[in-house]
Every structure is written in C-alpha cells, then in structure tokens.
C-alpha cells in the first residue's frame, strides 16, 4: 500500500485528455505515452502476458495461486481524462487531516468549500488530494489504475492470499464513449470484470443510463441585413424557439436518482444554419424511445409554425443499461458486496447517472459492474479524492479476488 499515493501522484502528471474530434484510437498522443509507461511498469512488477496494442489498450494477467479451478475475473480502468476541464500540468496537493472549512486550491482564489460540496462535512479527519484550482485532478480514472496496480503488486508479494487468474486492462477514450470500441474480450479472458471507476467509498453500481445523442439542425435564409425585411429567416432564432419548447424540468440540473433528462450540450450557430447537440438519458429503454419521440414531435410542431425555414432531427444510440446483462449473474454483485463488508465498507448500490466501459463490455459478453475509487467532483477543477478511499478500493480489489477463490473452493 505504501506505493499507492506516489503512484497516483505520478500518474496524474500525464496529460491524457481524450479529444472527441480526433477519430483515431487513442485520440490523444498523451494516452499513448501513458500507456507505454504503464506497460513498462507492469513488466517490471512481474505480471504475465503484459501487452500494449496498436489502439493503446494495456492488458496483463496475474496467474492463479490455487490448485483448483476458479473463474478468471478482471479489473478495468481508463487512461483518459475528461475534455471538460484542463488536464495539462496537473499539480495535486495533499490536505492532511482535514478538519472542515474551505480548502484553498493553489495560489489563486479558487476554494473547495463544504457549502458548495456538502460531502466535505463527512470527511473530517480524512486525508484529501485536491487540484491547485487550475485543472482537473484525474482521479477519474487514474485513481482506478493506481488502485488496481497496487492491489496486483501486493498480491504478487503475498502468496498467502488465495486468488484465481486475474486479468487487468487499461483503456483509452472512455470519456468520449469509445473505451470499448477495440477491447478484445477474448484476449482479456475473464468470466466477468469490474471497472474501478466509481466515486465515494462504498459505491457499487450495475445500472446505468440508456443513452443517445440528438442533433437538431435548423435551416434559415441568409441575406444582407440591409435588405432582409420579410426575406431573412434567422436559424439562430429558430434554434432558440426549439430550446424553449423542450421540458425545462427534465434537464441535468433538475434531475437525480432514476430520473432521465435532455441535456443541451453544444451548439453551432449562424443565420443560415444552426445546429444543437443534445444528449438524451433514461434508465428505461422505453423511456429513451419516448424522449426521442418527444423531440420528433417538437420538430414537427415547430415546422408547422414556421413560414420559412425548417428543422430536422437525427439520433445516434450511444450505450444501453447494463442491468439486463449483469442481473442474470447475481454472484458477481454478491461477491463484491461480501468483499466490501469484509473490508468494513458499507456497500452503497446506486444507479450510474452516466456510463462506463463496463456498460458496453456487458453487452459484449463481459458482465462488468462498477466499484468506487474514493473520488468526488469528477471532470472539474474541484475534483478531489481521499487517500482512505483509495486504500479501501485496493483492499476491496484484493478481497474480491480472495472471496472469489474461496467461493469456488467449496
């Protein structure tokens, strides 16, 4: 465990932001550099079958140390960080024995405040790792990588802990929805796996959104504004009308738990043509279909109102709820719960209001729920993680391996 924090602090200095407009895999050269460093570290640790493929996927195995058959299990984390905030020149800072109040982030005016982030009230006495207020931290998901590798390092050194074959993998471009695109499930050779990509201590997740992207294109008529009377149709005004027609109370800032939403995530505006990007989320497949139908109805309604100009909408499916693929294998969740309880961690089963590599992998034949990292406030400059949460994740990974081996000895 002694190498955990240093390992994490080293990993976050790699600039690995994924780039959604680059369709190569990985989408950024920083991920290639980080993947090479991880590949070399895994070789040095002495893991077996260490590989780095042309798409930047790193895989390795820890062979079984028991003399009876145990299904191979896997642990997965992703190397990229979110494009939503700067991920370059990350300068983590450690706050020891937090006792409440605002935490100054670096030398600027940014603070981490319990007023804005009430979870801090529950973390008195914990040791935190924060940003310096200028970048994200990268705990999502470099904490998961550090935790998996540290667990493998300890299991390699301590033969008294029984375990079957363990496969590990580190993927590129998860943050832009492509983490499973080139994942070789057959090569990974696990019966099931866990992504270590969750938040606070105890999180255990096997439900996620059904997801789609909607593109709304508004077509106008552009003319010289000096001669535009009764002729110009401003596509930006049409786009504004459409935005106001959407349900205001079904947006991310007004929803929680199992509630889905419409999220206007981007726009490209001009008089002649304006384009709106929405992400649609719902835990039920029928709910996602209903959201798409509502958008189609709003487009038809707006087209009827327009004397000139027109609107069209198209959809692209992103990922589906892994619940239907994980629930038929209840032992996967039960073993994770048992491992947490054995580590004095209370399991907190909740839906993922997002997606993980595990969601896609579950539909590729590798059931793959999600386990906590100990982190908070991902994708922004107020991201932080507790050292205690990271240590608990390492313990749970090792205990899961042990519990699985003992379960199949019986």
Curated annotation (Swiss-Prot):
Free-text remark on how the cofactor is bound: Binds 2 Zn(2+) ions per subunit.
Binding site for Zn(2+) 1: 78, 140, 197
The UniProt record lists the keyword Nucleotide-binding: no
Reactions mediated catalytically: Release of the N-terminal residue from a tripeptide
Active site per UniProt: 80, 174
Cellular-component GO terms for this entry: cytosol
Gene3D superfamilies, alphabetized: 3.30.70.360, Zn peptidases
Keyword Cytoplasm: yes
PROSITE patterns xref list: ARGE_DAPE_CPG2_1, ARGE_DAPE_CPG2_2
Subcellular localization(s) per the UniProt record: Cytoplasm
Keywords: Aminopeptidase, Cytoplasm, Hydrolase, Metal-binding, Metalloprotease, Protease, Zinc
SUPFAM superfamilies xref list: Bacterial exopeptidase dimerisation domain, Zn-dependent exopeptidases
A Gene Ontology BP annotation from the UniProt entry: peptide catabolic process
EC numbers for this chain: 3.4.11.4
Gene Ontology MF annotations: metallopeptidase activity; tripeptide aminopeptidase activity; zinc ion binding
Residues holding Zn(2+) 2: 140, 175, 379
CDD domains: M20_peptT
UniProt-listed InterPro entries: ArgE/DapE_CS (IPR001261), Bact_exopeptidase_dim_dom (IPR036264), Peptidase_M20 (IPR002933), Peptidase_M20_dimer (IPR011650), Peptidase_M20B (IPR010161)
Family membership noted in the UniProt record: Belongs to the peptidase M20B family.
NCBIfam families, per the entry: peptidase-T (TIGR01882), PRK05469.1 (NF003976), PRK13381.1 (NF009920)
Name of this chain's protein: Peptidase T
Lineage of the organism: Bacteria, Pseudomonadati, Pseudomonadota, Gammaproteobacteria, Vibrionales
């Amino acid at each position: 465990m002694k190498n955990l924090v240093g390992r994490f602090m080293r990993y976050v200095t790699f600039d690995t932001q994924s780039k959604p407009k680059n369709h190569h895999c990985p989408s950024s050269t920083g991920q290639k550099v980080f993947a090479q460093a991880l590949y070399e570290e895994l070789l040095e640790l002495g893991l077996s079958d260490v590989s780095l493929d042309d798409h930047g996927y790193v895989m390795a195995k820890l062979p079984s140390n028991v003399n009876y058959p145990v299904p191979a299990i896997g642990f997965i984390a992703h190397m990229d960080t979110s494009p939503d905030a700067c991920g370059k020149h990350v300068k983590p800072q450690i706050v020891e024995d937090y006792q409440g109040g605002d935490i100054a982030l670096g030398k600027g005016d940014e603070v981490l405040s319990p007023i804005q982030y009430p979870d801090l009230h529950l973390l008195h006495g914990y040791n935190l790792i924060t940003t310096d207020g200028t970048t994200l931290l990268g705990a999502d998901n470099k904490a998961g990588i550090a935790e998996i590798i540290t667990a493998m390092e300890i299991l390699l050194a301590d033969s008294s802990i029984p375990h079957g074959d363990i496969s590990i993998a580190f993927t590129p471009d998860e943050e832009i929805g492509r983490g499973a695109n080139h994942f070789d499930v057959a090569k990974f050779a696990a019966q099931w796996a866990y992504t270590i990509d969750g938040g606070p201590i105890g999180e255990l997740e096997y439900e996620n959104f059904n997801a789609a992207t909607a593109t709304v294109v508004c077509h106008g008529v552009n003319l010289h504004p000096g001669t535009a009377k009764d002729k110009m149709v401003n596509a930006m005004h049409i786009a504004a009308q459409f935005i106001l027609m959407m349900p205001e109370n079904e947006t991310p800032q007004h929803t929680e738990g199992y509630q889905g939403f419409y999220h206007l995530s981007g726009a490209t505006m001009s008089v002649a043509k304006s384009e709106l990007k929405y992400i649609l989320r719902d835990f039920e497949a029928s709910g996602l279909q209903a959201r798409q139908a509502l958008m189609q109805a709003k487009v038809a309604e707006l087209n009827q109102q327009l004397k000139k100009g027109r609107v069209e909408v198209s959809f692209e499916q992103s990922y589906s709820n892994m619940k239907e693929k994980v629930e038929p294998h209840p032992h996967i969740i039960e073993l994770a719960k048992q491992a947490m309880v054995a580590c004095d961690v209370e399991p907190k089963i909740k839906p993922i209001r997002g997606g993980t590599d595990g969601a896609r992998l579950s539909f590729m034949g590798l059931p793959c729920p999600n386990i906590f990292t100990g982190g908070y406030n991902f994708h922004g400059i107020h991201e932080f993680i507790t050292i205690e949460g990271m240590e608990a994740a390492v313990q749970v990974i090792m205990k899961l391996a042990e519990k699985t081996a003992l379960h199949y000895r019986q």
